[in-house]
Design a protein with these regions (language model features):
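Conserved active-site alpha-helix within GNAT-family acetyltransferase domains
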Residues: 1-3, 106, 118, 130-147
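A short, well-structured alpha-helix characteristic of acyl/acetyltransferase catalytic modules
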Residues: 31-42
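A conserved beta-strand-loop-helix scaffold within acyl/acetyltransferase catalytic domains
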Residues: 50-96
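Helix-loop element at the rim of GNAT/NAT acetyltransferase active sites that forms part
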Residues: 40-50
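Conserved acetyl-CoA-binding loop-helix of GNAT-fold acetyltransferases
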Residues: 95, 101-114, 118, 138
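Acyl-donor-binding surface of acyltransferase catalytic domains
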Residues: 1-33, 128, 150-151
């Protein structure tokens, strides 16, 4: 199915993240040891040794922040915020299949958007699958184009 390019609403005040447990908010950025966990959830594969160096490169340049949603040590969601002079992109927002519908994707998106705005982004974009489009619409994003295929 085609993916949709979405445009964000005007910047809201940064909302607090929704928490599954008050003591466990998503960290602002995955620790280097957490990159493998992030890559496993995002990619859906267990052997992520080839992916981690590329992820670490964005982290080292400070252009990318990786977010993990944990509950009791289990990774249930992930997202990334990529910033540049032109703005920011919210990417790879994934909730583990057995925890979809619990608000994790919404909370990660809100948190990622708040980070992008706090970094000075005046324009924030994301690409949504048909399954996630409703979440982003409820958060005020608009469709501005369609992506037929990623390469």
């Amino acid at each position: 199915p085609p993916r949709r390019q979405l445009r964000p609403p005007p910047p809201p005040p940064p909302p607090p993240p929704l928490l599954r447990t008050p003591a466990a908010p998503p960290p602002p950025r995955a620790a280097p040891a957490g990159l493998a966990e992030w890559a496993r959830l995002w990619s859906g594969v267990t052997d992520v040794d080839d992916l981690v160096p590329g992820l670490r490169e964005g982290m080292d340049r400070r252009s990318t922040r990786y977010l993990l949603w944990r509950d009791g040590g289990e990774v249930l969601g992930c997202a990334a915020v990529v910033t540049c002079a032109a703005g920011a992109s919210l990417e790879h927002i994934v909730t583990r299949a057995d925890h979809r519908g619990e608000g994790i994707g919404t909370a990660l998106t809100r948190y990622a958007l708040a980070l992008a705005l706090a970094a000075g982004a005046r324009r924030v974009v994301l690409t949504a699958s048909p399954d996630g489009e409703g979440i982003y619409r409820r958060l005020g994003f608009d469709t501005v184009g369609h992506v037929e295929r990623y390469a």
